[in-house]
Amino acid sequence: RTAKVKVAEPSQTLADDLARVEAVRDALGPHGRVRVDANGAWGVDEALAAIRQLARFDLEYVEQPCATVEELADLRVRLARVGVQVRIAADESIRRAEDPGRVVALAAADVAVLKVQPLGGVRRCLHLAEQLGLPVVVSSAIETSVGIAAGVALAAALPQLPFACGLNTLALLSTDVADDPLVVRDGQLDVRRVAPGGVGWQASDEVDRWWQQRRRTVEAGAGQVAGR
């Protein structure tokens, strides 16, 4: 069993984070796996202090403890100096970067977190995984079964999955667009196609007008560029 705990939330202290992670570790027992995600909220000094304390819970890895690739690289060096052996995973530093390869060039991470939708699809992620050469964790945003199925397809296509995928976010939605949603059973997801059901989803008139205006603006701008 694997659990991810969000840390470094604006309203929380390090003591709060330690208490939550300890509770999760106790619930999973010594054989469960615990990972934490700071979403880039710490500076290097904060991250070093926090990870030194969190390390006693036998973390699988710390995801995006700092915002920039340079900070992640500095943090890994400083963790090694003080003898703290905790993996660093890069998420935002890959999917929001113009050059994801800098994570490897600067030795900024031990693990790559790949999300299909923001990275441009399954094939793009497979190419990126090969390019990075790091152990991969396939993860998702808060998506319907249609999006989760793409993540499952990526996971199935990778030669190795050393860590559990982070694809159980469908439970955070109140409903799904698929008649036969992907549901985790015994810690696993089926590899299969998922199609939206027959239920219609209609935007409000206000939202529809906003998007139509946005489309017209974009098309007008594209036409001006093409006419130069």
Where are these regions (language model features)?
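Catalytic core of soluble alpha/beta enzymes
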Residues: 5-149, 175-177, 182-184
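Flexible C-terminal active-site loop/helix
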Residues: 142-228
